[in-house]
Amino acid sequence: MGKEKVHINIVVIGHVDSGKSTTTVHVIYKLGGIDKRVIERFEKEADEMNKRSFKYAWLLDKLKAERERGITIDIALLKFETTKYYSTVMDAPGHRDFIKNMITGTSQADCAVLIIDSTTGGFEAGISKDGQTREHALLAFTLGVKQMICCCNKMDATTPKYSKGRYEEIVKEVSSYLKEVGYNPDKIPFVPISGFEGDNMIERSTNLDWYKGPTLLDALDNINEPKRPSDKPLRLPLQDVYKIGGIGTVPVGRVETGVVKPGMLVTFAPTGLTTEVKSVEMHHEALTEALPGDNVRFNVKNVAVKDLKHGLVASNSKDDPAKDAANFTSQVIIMNHPGQIGNGYAPVLDCHTSHIAVKFAELITKIDRRSGKEIEKEPKFLKNGDAGMVKMIPTKPMVVETFAEYPPLGRFAVRDMRQTVAVGVIKSVEKKDPTGAKVTKAAAKKK
């Protein structure tokens, strides 16, 4: 069998009509995750509705509908295997909460696949000032997605078909704005493809014989292997807490950094409650330790369900335990706010699993998004497209960390008027010292 393949997470970004769905499903169709019987069933339905030409996107819509109804076939669907990796496609855009999901999302994407519509008019729409292509690329870069693959899609529909000139024009323009966002375009493969016809997706296409670079599959295989933060102190944000008869209180969450194992003393912040972990399980199997990326249930001693809730963060009591944040300073990019944001603004912050109102206590500086250099001290306000350093104060106890130390607890979405108005990363945190926090009997014995 050899060594098991490494898992990577991919996020697919690009303008709404760029062909993201078709391309994504085509890759999955060819490499993996979909049961052939499911495909046949969908194809038959597509035929009956004369939607054959639309089969891949039709398949994805179908899957989306099943996902929305809560049918759980979806997760295997968005998985595929390359020669080197097991890949999972994270929630692709088009989803209303894409921005929020990408930030508070269950995991950090290791690579962004940017799909560009190469057709006349299509490319221009995607890349225009209000096109989503820029916003998605900026978002990916801000949130620390270091690697990118760019697919020049719909090459079968350029004028003339499979036009080398059109490809070169697009590479030049997209490179210049990816550079503006912060990426190094020389390190990004630009793959001319047809997500619909399948050119250069898995195998080399004779229609594009002027192109000598990697296929999409090759480019995915060339992604640098991600380093998982198991050597850092434990951070495990709680998604939920259950009471299970005969077992007791069972918190559920994803290990973001570090490891958790039976016998460990954990402290839940911001409340400061300390207790011992009795057992850890994933997919109903007991684990001797859980690693970053694992979604686990763990059982804790002498703790009532009411003492725990989603948004709390479990950490190792003896290794840099998490604490309540008094205030923190963040680099914020305003993306979608109709007016001006000034001191005193109080939106909701979605950070890891917590949703808490915070106050923008002080706009410290306005900065250049690309270079990070200061443009203005103590600006009166920030508006769409602006970036700034802001001091924030949570209105309730809250755990956050710096993006540099604990990335999943250091990036956030700012929500207001039911939408994401800004995104940010946390640069520094001033923490409170816990006072008189409760320690369970089991934990007191272990100390």
Curated annotation (Swiss-Prot):
It comes from Pisum sativum (Garden pea). This is Elongation factor 1-alpha. Residues 70-74 are annotated as: G2. The modification 5-glutamyl glycerylphosphorylethanolamine is found at E289, E362. The modification N6,N6-dimethyllysine is found at K55. Residues 14-21 are annotated as: G1. SUPFAM superfamilies: EF-Tu/eEF-1alpha/eIF2-gamma C-terminal domain, P-loop containing nucleoside triphosphate hydrolases, Translation proteins. GTP binds at residues 14-21, 91-95, 153-156. GO terms for molecular function: GTP binding; GTPase activity; translation elongation factor activity. Residues 194-196 are annotated as: G5. Residues 153-156 are annotated as: G4. PANTHER family: TRANSLATION FACTOR. The lineage of its organism: Eukaryota, Viridiplantae, Streptophyta, Embryophyta, Tracheophyta. InterPro entries: EFTu-like_2 (IPR004161), G_TR_CS (IPR031157), GTP-eEF1A_C (IPR054696), P-loop_NTPase (IPR027417), T_Tr_GTP-bd_dom (IPR000795), TRAFAC_GTPase_members (IPR050100), Transl_B-barrel_sf (IPR009000), Transl_elong_EF1A/Init_IF2_C (IPR009001). Belongs to the TRAFAC class translation factor GTPase superfamily. Classic translation factor GTPase family. EF-Tu/EF-1A subfamily. It is found in: Cytoplasm. Its main location: cytoplasm. PROSITE patterns: G_TR_1, G_TR_2. Keywords: Cytoplasm, Elongation factor, GTP-binding, Methylation, Nucleotide-binding, Phosphoprotein, Protein biosynthesis. The modification N6-methyllysine is found at K261. NCBIfam families: EF-1_alpha, PRK12317.1. This protein promotes the GTP-dependent binding of aminoacyl-tRNA to the A-site of ribosomes during protein biosynthesis. Residues 5-230 form the tr-type G domain.
